[in-house]
Amino acid sequence: MKKIFSGRVFDVLPLSDGIIFSYCKDVIDENTIVSYKMISFENGHFTDVARNIYLLTKFGNNYKATAMFCGNYITAKSIVLPNSKVFLLEDNGSAALLDNDATLLWSGELKYRGGAAADIALYKNTLWASFPECNVLLRYNLSTMREELRIGGNKSPFSRPDVLFVEGDSVMVCNSVSSKLIQVDLNSYSVFEYEDFEEPIHQYVQVGDCRFAVLDSGLYLI
């Protein structure tokens, strides 16, 4: 495992040939200055990119209007669906589905036993959400937004499941308390301990053969 960026990384977005990430550039008078970098797999170089490039990658073509729906566009979670609609999740569990012109189609909450969802991931025509306070993952029908399946609970294999990443027929679950990356098979719903880190893992992303992890100390190439 190799550290490729030191510092606080907020969000990593996969590209077809690299990644874009937001990070803390500075803190001035308690205000966080956010900047953005891109890593290209073609040459391995880091490039500073504009905020609009980050927003386009995160929210799709109508990124300006979509970002207006977010209280904080850095911490908000988003999924650009195959039909170009965008599903948004805020820190407090409030959620929205926007048409490709940013028209609001649905709004509601993703909560379980009072706890807000921390992240969302798309698998086929279903939406998966993580709930750290209850140590569960929930599957929703994307058409009806009704809960269909729960993994975890009182004897959960998770320890505050947070950020999700779907790769093939599995969802990778970051667990900040145990510092473990847990793999869930989305066909059999079997749960495996995939990787154990020496510090809390906050995000996992895979692009091609390259795997990345965001830890307290920075961004790593696994």
Put a short name on every predicted segment.
Residues F21-E30, L88-N92, A129-N135, V173-V177, ...:
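Conserved beta-strand positions in repeat-built beta-propeller and related beta-rich domains
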Residues S35-S40:
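Beta-propeller blade signature
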